[in-house]
A protein has these predicted regions:
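Glycine-rich, acidic loop segments that terminate in or are immediately followed by a histidine
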Residues: 337-436
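A structured phosphate/pyrophosphate-recognition subdomain
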Residues: 115-120, 127, 210-347, 356-375
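Short aromatic-glycine-enriched beta-strand elements
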Residues: 14-22
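An N-terminal, well-structured beta->alpha segment
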Residues: 68-123, 139
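Structural detector for short beta-strands of small beta-barrel domains
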Residues: 1-15, 45-47
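N-terminal small/polar loop signature for handling phosphorylated ligands or for N-terminal nucleophile
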Residues: 111, 119-120, 126-129, 139-211
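OB-fold/S1-family single-stranded nucleic acid-binding modules
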Residues: 48-77
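Beta-strand/loop nucleic-acid-binding surfaces
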Residues: 24-39
């Protein structure tokens, strides 16, 4: 059967005597052409059709390059054709009522990107919340997926992504559960300078100028009270729901992973989050989102990993208790924990998780736990202490008073961390105690 089709060239491969051109209109197909065309060109191809697996191909007899105006028309038609679902949010807070229309806008962007076959990079943070968000977003469109072990989108990350995006069609970078902080701005600025569109889905306190560099989906845009409790994984699930994907079963896993109380969750939700955190620790072994999903759906493997994770946490409790040092200041108890005596690099649990073990031991008190190592100081603030102490505010003061010793820092009001120059942890700890 002969077919004539007009579309935007989104990918080019060279196979023997032909160039295989992937073209996008409202659908995608391949054109076998003896002539080369650049990614982004609009062509009209005419020829006989054939199937390669499930992919329709046109073996071109004629190929004509079209005008730039045609390209704009195709993009506009695709955008007009895309519809998203207008679901009620799963969590019915004032923040979500305001955020949900913006989640639908992001959903539409992603569906349009899928129809246009845009080159997409998805980076998700290496914890239960970030992984849940990554699973939700990756269900919407094809993307190169990377686990991000740092809370910062660095200049190095940006240069890696810029290099990967070279010669690809309308590149798009999506960051989930990280990338909104001040330290990420330099990396985001490079993406913008190279013309790469960026979407950041994050629930951490953001840099003031984040929206100059990215489409920013965040609860912080709609008020600070309880903003961080609206986890990035949950927000990503709402984006996926607007695209017709159902990941409601992962909402409480995301909340449990970040100890958010917006919905009540069961021990099973905590266990799922624990398994994801356990797996994320070993990301150097090439974990993928598909792997995380498969583990959650294989009962024997899931139970084995859950047992190992719980055993490791239980075995550390006595060591944590023995290494906690106690100080008092203005009615607040400050617990200091030397993490280098307990943590093993590259092994579960992480320094943050070990600090949380100490926090769980004292969470009923008016207390702050400061876990420290050669390069990090980790904050955990109990509910009672949080009435007077804000971890993020302390970090900002430390950044101002000792900028030469601080590499980065931030997080939530009751759970945050500082990265410091090696060997200065004692001096910075004393500064923190003074501020408290």
């Amino acid at each position: 059967m002969e077919l004539e089709k007009t579309g935007i060239v989104t990918r080019v491969k060279n196979i023997k005597d032909f160039f295989v051109l992937t073209i996008a209109d409202r659908e995608q197909l391949e054109v076998l052409s003896k002539e080369f065309y650049n990614v982004g060109d609009v062509i009209t191809a005419k020829g006989e059709t054939q199937l390669r697996g499930e992919t329709l191909q046109i073996v071109a007899k004629e190929v004509k390059k079209e005008s730039e105006e045609k390209r704009k028309r195709i993009c506009d038609e695709i955008e007009k054709s895309v519809r998203v679902l207008e679901n009620e949010p799963i969590i019915k807070t004032e923040v979500m009522k305001k955020l949900i229309p913006h989640a639908r806008e992001v959903a539409k962007k992603l569906l349009v990107a899928k129809k246009l076959n845009r080159f997409t990079i998805l980076r998700f943070h290496a914890d239960a919340d970030g992984i849940v968000g990554g699973i939700a977003i990756s269900s919407i469109l094809n993307a190169q997926k990377f686990q991000q072990n740092s809370a910062i989108y660095s200049v190095r990350d940006a240069l890696t992504d810029i290099n990967s995006a070279r010669n690809n069609f309308m590149p798009l970078v999506i960051l989930v559960d990280f990338g909104a902080n001040e330290e990420s701005i330099s990396g985001l600025e490079l993406l913008k300078a190279d013309g790469i569109e960026t979407i950041v889905i994050d629930h951490h306190p953001p840099a003031k100028n984040i929206e100059q560099y990215a489409c920013f989906l965040s609860p912080w845009k709609f008020g600070e009270e309880n903003a961080s409790k609206h986890t990035a994984g949950y927000i990503a699930i709402e984006v996926a729901r607007a695209c017709g994907m159902d990941f409601e079963k992962y909402v409480k896993t995301s909340l449990a992973g970040d100890k958010s109380d917006l919905l009540p969750f069961e021990d099973e939700d905590k266990n799922k989050a624990l398994v994801l955190d356990y797996l994320a620790t070993y990301s150097s072994f090439g974990n993928s989102l598909d792997f995380y999903r498969e583990v959650m759906e294989k009962p024997a493997l899931y139970e084995s990993m859950l047992r190992q994770a719980k055993e490791k946490l239980e075995n550390l409790k006595e060591s944590v208790k023995a290494n906690l040092k106690k100080r008092e200041k203005d009615g607040i108890t400050i617990y200091l924990l030397n993490l280098d005596r307990i943590a093993t690099k590259g092994e579960f649990p992480s320094r943050g998780k070990i600090t949380s073990i100490a926090y769980d031991m004292v969470k009923g008190e008016n207390a702050i736990v400061l876990g420290y190592s050669e390069k990090y100081i980790i904050f955990r603030v109990t509910d009672e202490a949080a009435k007077k102490v804000n971890a993020n505010e302390i970090i900002e003061k430390i950044k101002s008073s000792a900028p030469d010793f601080i590499e980065s820092g931030g997080g939530h009001d009751k759970a945050a961390s500082l990265k410091i120059r090696k060997g200065f942890e004692k001096e910075i700890l004393e500064e923190i105690v003074k501020i408290i």
